[in-house]
Amino acid sequence: MRFIPKVKTNMTTWTSGYVTQMDYTTGYYSELNPTYAQFVFLSAGLKSPVINRACELGFGQGVSLNIHAAGSNIEWWGTDFIPAHAAFAQDLADASGANLTIYDESFEEFCNREDLPTFDFISFHGVWSWISAENRQHIINFLDRKLAVGGVVYSGYNTLAGWASFLPLRGILKQAAGHGDSISGDRVSQAVKFCTELLKVDSHYLTINPTVRQFYDEIQSYDPRYLAHEFLNQNWDPMNFSEISEFMSEAKLEYACSADLINHLPYLNFNKEQSDLLNTIDSLSLRETVADLMLNRRFRKDYWVRGKIELTEEELASKWLAQEFVFVTEY
């Protein structure tokens, strides 16, 4: 449970266009858990590595990071460049005594450190879609440099298929809320109200994109802090799977499987006609991108691996027989 002060850099602005005036909401994400990842790999029939060291990039309030560090023997490192986030995460680590080292550094600062070990598991949830192209490249270079052979990467990111129709309204929402130091909870609420009035006016945009109103009605009730971090950063770039795959290939990573177990059962997502079409596509990259379009998927949760190894039938059977389960219920 160590806090490491940041090193000096030549950055002209530490925010890089990211919302920092409002702290992010708290939340827990099981996909960031290496133990969960190992089970998902088993479900996909893939070999997973022994994970001794793990790292989370852009951990927010650090709830998932702290739970995973406190609940295992894995050594954890993590960074979030908003000082209030790092301080809150450090308080949690101090309380639990977790084997965890916390930084409040930017991706440029953290990813270029020379004193970090090689990691078996590296994760980032959401932030890929909210950061600049330069910061995305810092992450890719970090994966290339610091992920062990056989290591696993988790990436959660906004998908273009589900967000394309919302892009124009997001731009108006961002402009109405202001930018830089002017963003506040009140400004976010005012911007939401303005867009609500806008959507009451008949327009060709809504005629062609009827689902936009339904989705906007849903997000109106969201915490302004969530809306600010989700939609109001300078950079907001939903991407196709094919684009992410190209980035990952720079770090010698290949797609392993979805972190969402329901996607391991295609018949729950696709009808026969859809499945037949998908089965004609040889390219994994194109197939996943087309699947996202069919589902109008807004968010992907993916595992990537440096050295993909499929388990034999004997290995798979042996591992399933050795797998332990705990059944829980709500009272």
Set out the residue ranges of the language-model regions.
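Conserved SAM-binding loop of SAM-dependent methyltransferases across substrates and taxa
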Residues: 61-73
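Conserved class I S-adenosyl-L-methionine
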Residues: 152-182, 190, 198-204
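Rossmann-like AdoMet/SAM-dependent catalytic core
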Residues: 206-331
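A short acidic, Gly/Pro-enriched loop at the edge of an enzyme's catalytic core
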Residues: 112-121
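Conserved SAM-binding strand-loop segment of SAM-dependent methyltransferases
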Residues: 97-109
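Conserved alpha-helix/loop element of class I SAM-dependent methyltransferases that forms part
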Residues: 21-52
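A short glycine-rich, Lys/Arg-flanked "PGG" loop and its adjoining helix->strand segment in the class I
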Residues: 137-149
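Conserved SAM-binding motif I beta-strand of class I
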Residues: 75-80
